[in-house]
């Protein structure tokens, strides 16, 4: 078994004007257990960043902290700064629901509402008081086009979303998330329940989406990280070990631990 120096790290940083989101000294605790150990990380605007690492490394916990999804867990506590547009969104006075309009999330398994395809998109807007049908129609079409789903469902908008395939349901969930025009889209293993063809379609959708959004994705699939991301961060035991351009991580990692992990020789 290889012995690694876990105190040795290599973390990429960006000029401030390119940063869409950043964290400073973020820790996450579940009760007395420290799951995330003081992570400093910056995410470049309009790029795709992949978070990789073994199961239990903390990458999903860290991702969920970025728009305070960990708030839903009673024993979870998040400390440190999560900076979006110069504002620490981890402060207690922040309106979490408003913040999530700017930092949206797509979950591991597709979770469409048991409503029509159309109302999956419009539901949040209707609750916010949007009543003009033309406006709602435009939101639906724009969002579905951005999620590369419009051509497949435009004649079936009033059918149940539950009739869609798994890949289509996941792209509908993406359309629903981006319909409120977030700046940042968090994706927690969005392809884990999809077949290879649907996964490829999802990755193609991500490439298009990054023109308008900053995407941060957790994946266990090394090939997906290598194919679909601009930057990759390697997590281990709640810490960020190496963060660099994806090509560097997979072809010329600075640290032996990272190189061993992405090449399948870790341990």
Curated annotation (Swiss-Prot):
Lineage: superkingdom: Bacteria
GO molecular function, one term: ATP hydrolysis activity
CDD domains, per the entry: ABC_PstB_phosphate_transporter (cd03260)
UniProtKB keywords: ATP-binding, Cell membrane, Membrane, Nucleotide-binding, Phosphate transport, Translocase, Transport
Disulfide bond positions: none
SUPFAM superfamilies: P-loop containing nucleoside triphosphate hydrolases (SSF52540)
Residues involved in ATP binding: 53-60
Uppermost EC category: translocase
Location(s), subcellular: Cell membrane
Pfam family, any one: ABC_tran
Topology of the protein relative to the lipid bilayer: Peripheral membrane protein
EC number(s) from the headed UniProt entry: 7.3.2.1
A Gene Ontology biological process term: phosphate ion transmembrane transport
Annotated catalysed reactions: phosphate(out) + ATP + H2O = ADP + 2 phosphate(in) + H(+)
Subunit structure: The complex is composed of two ATP-binding proteins (PstB), two transmembrane proteins (PstC and PstA) and a solute-binding protein (PstS).
Family: Belongs to the ABC transporter superfamily. Phosphate importer (TC 3.A.1.7) family.
Role this protein plays: Part of the ABC transporter complex PstSACB involved in phosphate import. Responsible for energy coupling to the transport system.
Protein name as annotated: Phosphate import ATP-binding protein PstB 2
